[in-house]
A protein has these predicted regions:
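Intrinsically disordered, low-complexity repeat tracts enriched in Gly/Pro/Ser/Thr and acidic residues
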Residues: 1-182
């Protein structure tokens, strides 16, 4: 449990893990500093060069925050008990992007994923980081709209062929048209 207020500490090193935290802490009722926890606004620097800036609670990232990984990947959004959870945006160093809902550090719920400078776009449902449910996938002018399972066209769907202008509507199995369709 926390105390009656917060104090700001500018230089605190977590020797065990080599992390450095600057920010707000609780003041425990008994004034034993070793029982205080990060609570409020803070900055955490990791030994690999990664950096978190944002809200903390019970010594975990909690609330709105931004994690910049040492490789240049960035997540900005909501955190719950140390994990990306809620609404957020992830951008990797190649320019790929995901914007949408998160749960337990994974894409989960409704979202949009874009690759190759926006030339490939998926908009739809995600479950535990995988494209699963209903969605739309656009690439090279072609488009698939329908059911996805684990990132593949699987179930009922419609495929628009950009070059011929033809449309296949019917069943799909593991990214392939299955049956006659129409």
């Amino acid at each position: 449990g926390g105390g009656k207020g917060l104090f700001w500490n500018t230089r605190v090193k977590d020797i065990k893990k080599g992390r450095k935290y600057r920010g707000q802490w609780t003041i425990p009722k008994n004034n034993k500093k070793e029982e205080s926890v990060w609570e409020g606004l803070g900055i955490m620097e990791f030994p690999d060069g990664s950096r978190y800036e944002g809200m903390t609670k019970n010594s975990l990232f909690h609330g709105k925050g931004r994690m910049t990984h040492s490789n240049g990947d960035i997540y900005q959004g909501e955190w719950v008990e140390g994990k990306a959870c809620g609404k957020g945006v992830f951008i990797d160093q190649q320019g790929s992007m995901y914007e949408g809902e998160w749960k337990n550090d994974a894409y989960h719920g409704k979202g949009t994923e874009q690759w190759n400078h926006n030339t490939i776009v998926y908009t739809g449902d995600f479950v535990d980081g995988q494209k699963t449910g209903k969605g739309k996938f656009e690439f090279d002018g072609n488009m698939y709209q329908g059911d996805f399972v684990d990132g593949k066209f699987h179930g009922r769907g419609k495929y628009y062929f950009a070059e011929s202008g033809k449309i296949y509507e019917g069943d799909f199995r593991e990214n392939n048209m299955d049956g006659k369709g129409r």
